[in-house]
Amino acid sequence: MAIQGYAEGIQAGVMDTGSAAEVILEESDRMTELVEELLDISKIDMGRQLLAFSEMDIRELLYDSIRAVEPTVVSGGIAIVPDFPEEPIMVKCDDMQMRRAVTNILSNGVRYARSELRLTCRADKRHVTIRIQDDGDGIAEVDLPHIFDRFYMGKSGKSGIGLALTREIIHLHKGTIRARNGDTGAVFEISIPVSR
C-alpha cells in the first residue's frame, strides 16, 4: 500500500518529507472516497439510501458538475465542451446524488480523454438524455459488458465501485445508463424522466 511505504520512507529518513506527505494525502483522499462509496452502495442494498427529490433545471446541475472537475481539467489540459438547449429542462432529482453520478462520469472522461470531453443534453416529452463522450481510446471490448459491475477492475485497475454506484443512483431516479464506444472514445448516456 502506497501510504504505508511512504510513511516508512519518512520514518527511515530516506524520503523527502514534503513529496511523501503529498502522496500520503492523495492516497488518504482516495481511500476516504472508496469507503464513502462502499457505505453508500451498502445503504442502497439495504434500502436505506434516502433521496431528497426536488425539481430543478438539469442544465444547472450539469454546469455544477463541470465546475467540480475543473481543477483536474485545467491541470490535464482537457477542454469540456457543453452543448445544452437554451430552454430549461426540468427534472425531479436528488441534486447531490445526481451531481455525484454525473461528476463521476466526467472525472472518468477527463482521466481518459486526450484533449476534449463533450457533454450534451437533449430532452423529448418524457426523458432527458445526458451524453458524455471523451476522445480517448474507448473502453476495451472485453470490459464493456462489465463496466457497471461492482468490483470489476478491467484494464484500468480502479476499484470498480464508482460506476456501479453511479448506475445505482441513476436507477433510483428511474433512469438508465449505458456505455459504448463511439467514433472516438467512450460514450456514456444517462436518461432520466423529465418532470414537465
What name fits each language-model region?
Residues 46-51, 90-93:
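Conserved micro-motifs of the catalytic ATP-binding
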Residues 54-55, 74, 79-89:
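Conserved catalytic submotifs in the C-terminal HATPase_c
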Residues 139-151:
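Short conserved segment of the HATPase_c
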